[in-house]
Regions:
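Glycine-enriched catalytic-core subsegment of oxygenase/oxidase enzymes
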Residues: 54, 64-67, 71-81, 250, ...
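Extracellular structured ligand-interaction cores
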Residues: 36, 114, 182-184, 214, ...
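Secondary-structure transition/capping motifs at alpha-helix termini
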Residues: 58, 147-153, 176-180, 262-266, ...
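A structural signal for well-ordered alpha-helical segments within the folded catalytic domains
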Residues: 115, 119, 142, 164-168, ...
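A contiguous active-site-proximal alpha/beta segment in oxidoreductase catalytic domains
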Residues: 127-129, 135-211, 216
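Structural recognition of the beta-strand scaffold that forms the well-ordered cores
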Residues: 38-42, 63-67, 106-107, 129-130, ...
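N-terminal glycine-/serine-/threonine-rich beta1-alpha1-beta2 phosphate-ribose binding loop
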Residues: 1-130, 142-154
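Rossmann-like dinucleotide-binding domain that binds NAD(P)(H)
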Residues: 211, 215-300
């Protein structure tokens, strides 16, 4: 197990010093016609497993390195069994010492370790697919953007839903002026996905399993005792030290098409309502009202986008203009336009509402947009450095 002081000092230095502390690999290297992209995966369980297996399904890819702080069956164990030819590591820093062993990195760790791993990878000239949310803080996101541009690497944030037909169809409906200028937007996530909300940090500790490198799991976060099923492997999303809460977990999926559809930039004002919070956990619910500068697609000089999260929390139906027969999905958005509404959700198809305007309207279907968000860094993208969906500089 790594020494906490040396590890955190190293990570702090690499994050703050940024691009100045590493030397990028040269782009003079040219991949041959039959070359395969060598992939290293940091984080091999949960979402890391699906990212890894989806990427490895491409004949253009060879999995050459696996890294996870958990050596048990459901993490590094299963990955090593499926890809026995790959080198194995429990410390990403040791992996990065073998920089000739891989061309690109998949980073599928808890949120707080996204930037501390992705930044050094880019500084080594490695292409990076990093899971959403891109970083734990705004400062880290800005550093990631600078590094991606400086080292001219292919990057992607792993918000796979951005590629789905429903999302891109909803964007097209707005861009085509189908519902007129948009007046307001309501977006929601009615409870966490796959993890349970808690009130406070439990007391006590338990022995650390031999297969778990707990100190390396904590990474840049403050030290805390190990408790099974409280942090690792999935419930870390409750904790401010490790995640960005419900808004960070699913806002990147649900608000993404809103930003794309309306071409939004930075908000002018943000007003949040939530129960009292402490230094450990995220609140169980929140309502966040954003006011953005208007665009050519909005009805006014500004537009209000309201976010709702928490168990069974939805926008009030009054004022949405939706038919009574329409049941709000567990997560999604309603964009209210001058001529009607567009409903969009990761749970289903894009829809339009306003019987008098859309009685015979047929919704166009935008084909599924395959990208690095769905299949990992492709050899063609690495060769040409072509622009992909959801790049690190974009986010």
């Amino acid at each position: 197990m790594s020494r906490p002081s040396s590890r955190r000092a190293f990570l702090k230095h690499s994050l703050v010093a940024g691009a100045a502390t590493w030397t990028a690999a040269s782009w003079s290297r040219v991949y041959g016609a039959n070359s395969r992209l060598k992939i290293a995966s940091v984080g091999t369980g949960g979402k890391g497993w699906s990212d890894l297996t989806a990427t490895a399904a491409s004949p253009q890819v060879e999995v050459t390195a696996l890294c996870d702080i958990d050596e048990s069956k459901n993490f590094l164990g299963q990955a090593a069994e499926k890809y026995p030819q790959a080198q194995r590591f429990t410390d990403w820093r040791r992996l990065f010492e073998h920089k000739k062993a891989f061309d690109a990195v998949i980073v599928s760790t808890p949120d707080h370790m996204h930037a501390p791993i992705s930044l050094p990878a880019m500084q080594l000239g490695k292409h990076v697919q990093c899971q959403k949310p891109l970083t734990h803080t705004v400062f880290e996101a800005r550093q990631m953007r600078l590094a991606a541009k400086k080292y001219n690497v292919v990057t992607q944030m792993g918000n796979q839903i951005q590629s789905h037909e429903a999302y891109r169809t909803a964007v097209k409906l707005v861009h085509d002026g189908t519902i007129g200028k948009v007046k307001e937007v309501h977006s929601w996530q009615s409870g966490p996905v796959g993890w349970r909300l808690v009130d406070d940090r439990p007391a006590g500790s338990q022995p650390i399993p031999e297969t778990l490198h707990w100190d390396d799991w904590l990474g840049v976060a403050p030290t805390r005792p190990y408790l099974p099923k409280i942090y690792h492997s999935f419930n870390w999303r409750n904790w401010r030290d490790f995640s960005n809460g419900q808004l960070g977990d699913f806002g990147c999926h649900i608000l993404d098409p809103v930003f794309m559809a309306l071409k939004l930039t930075a908000p002018l004002t943000i007003k949040a309502e939530a129960p009292a919070m402490n230094n450990d956990v995220w609140t169980k619910w929140a309502t966040v009202a954003y006011e953005f500068p208007g665009t050519e697609l909005t009805a006014g000089k500004t537009i209000k986008v309201t976010w709702y999260d928490g168990d069974d929390r939805y926008p009030a139906r009054e004022g949405l203009g939706l038919p009574e027969s329409y049941k709000l999905p567990a997560s999604g958005s309603v964009l209210i336009g001058e001529l009607g509404q567009v409903g969009n959700s990761p749970c289903g198809d894009a829809q339009t509402f306003s019987p008098e305007n859309f009685a015979e309207f047929k919704i166009p279907i935008v084909p599924y947009a395959r990208s690095l968000a769905s299949r990992g860094p492709t050899l063609a993208a690495v060769k040409t450095r072509r622009r992909l969906l959801s790049t690190t500089p974009d986010h």
